[in-house]
Amino acid sequence: MNISDVISFDILVSAMKTGNQSFGTDFLLVGLFQYGWINSLLFVVIATLFTVALTGNIMLIHLIRLNTRLHTPMYFLLSQLSIVDLMYISTTVPKMAVSFLSQSKTIRFLGCEIQTYVFLALGGTEALLLGFMSYDRYVAICHPLHYPMLMSKKICCLMVACAWASGSINAFIHTLYVFQLPFCRSRLINHFFCEVPALLSLVCQDTSQYEYTVLLSGLIILLLPFLAILASYARVLIVVFQMSSGKGQAKAVSTCSSHLIVASLFYATTLFTYTRPHSLRSPSRDKAVAVFYTIVTPLLNPFIYSLRNKEVTGAVRRLLGYWICCRKYDFRSLY
């Protein structure tokens, strides 16, 4: 018996001692944290990252909405990405925090189903949005004369609608199928949220055929956009190196590399989770990998896609200057 089994058994016994009568239909989440000062410190770190991610995404959304200079296709797609990230990180971290603070690991069947659906829908939407954003940069740099036509408001709205619809439909199909399966083993989910691979380990019938469906979905929704991103940025770099000076080339390489690092972090970790066979899974490793696409990427996206942009940083400075002036005026009015 390994340490993961011991922890799971302890949580199971603890839940039974609390007299939870709904244990037969509810699930129990092992969680990311156990109890102790090290895990309490880790909880504080995660809570801080969550707060920073919320603040960064909310600020970027409002900044794009309020500043008319940022009402362009690129920033429209970026605002949609921030909305997705805002909802994405809020799907898992608050429940994880409540479970840790209240020492209650229970999640109701319906709550688990809703969390699975929302998480899958937002993950699929983000994967497609990142692909569309790379296409926007490709058109802007490689086909600037055709940019107004290829990235019109109508096309941008169609891209966003396609991303949301595809992510939602994919999530609905998988959630509907998984939660009609017989969970005839322990209701203990060795994860910090309800995720399809973790749920499949509780199913008593053979799920190998369905796992091929998960693999196919992962290749379509995750791998294809990632390949499109790689191709787009490769073409962008080729064009930049043919046309720009050394300074422009260095800036393009720096920008593209930062975008690629964040995108690669998201796609690599999600592909690692959703395209591996069940026999190669490790609950502890799966939880560690999940932290990257549930917490780290929503934290990094607003900063990576905006801090290197002069228009966004300029808008932030103007907004802060306006806020400081207003605060000074309000302070002086008291006297």
UniProtKB/Swiss-Prot annotation:
The keyword Transmembrane applies. One of its GO terms (biological process) is detection of chemical stimulus involved in sensory perception of smell. Keywords: Cell membrane, Disulfide bond, G-protein coupled receptor, Glycoprotein, Membrane, Olfaction, Receptor, Sensory transduction, Transducer, Transmembrane, Transmembrane helix. InterPro entries: GPCR_Rhodpsn (IPR000276), GPCR_Rhodpsn_7TM (IPR017452), Olfact_rcpt (IPR000725). The gene is OR2AK2. It is found in: Cell membrane. PANTHER family: OLFACTORY RECEPTOR (PTHR26453). GO terms for cellular component: plasma membrane. The keyword Transmembrane applies. This is Olfactory receptor 2AK2.
